[in-house]
């Protein structure tokens, strides 16, 4: 009997949880389909659902409901946070400069590039071998009074957790807006914005069991950003357009579940991750665990296999019934290593053999056992193929 496939790519996206689907479905049907800006009963019903969702997201992250601005996802929220902060600074006569780390999500790096296209500049902070941001470099950048600093809470490729409280505090002391991409943090690490000097924070639904196409930017100071799209007056004019009510309801429910279950899930996922790492090392002794020397979120395991190509590893894992992902990107026909691993100082040859295994709500010990069982044969096959092709 064929075994069901194993999904270990939860950092890319997650299945919609049944409770979340149940909560959002009424807002896609004749019950409460109205436009939340309409004054009639259909609109009022939709508005009630939207505002309840706003309250749920706020409770999950430690914010006020009025600070939650719904977006189409993490990428839009990141752009609103960075480009919006830069534009607001320019309107105040400030410095048009965005400071980011070298291991940010591509959405953050692209938004910083967009600030350059507006006539500003970007500063990219280095990280150490464990993926931690260089705080001395941060202090030097803050001395130039940039418009915004953006440092992700949990890295999406290796799971490294930044000292976000210290970083936010330094930005606040310097009078600089601080944004964090918390997409991989929500539901995985303790998150309470009331304890942080954080101006802006991004969250996304499809990483925690809600559907794709919904996220939020938590805006704790509306003066810190300017709108980057233009239209109606929805959401204080910061994000015009008719809100995705069903998506917002889904995000609210998913965020509530994720935070309620976080402590127990963190223990469970951390145990699964460590068991997976140990069993993989037993089968592939020279395997490298990336970011191992730093605090990591419980759901992400980044490994590098010497003498192997990540794309080949992923293809053969898929054939063996295991879904994982790579941090590398194909550009102009050439595979380049992950910018995150390169920034952390991993040799190019090793970085080209890196893959990410990410756990989620439905991951089980059986999944770990299955991956550990198939990995040695997959690695041997890929290494043999690389030798035949003259790549090692």
Model-derived regions, located:
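Pyridoxal 5′-phosphate
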Residues: 1-392
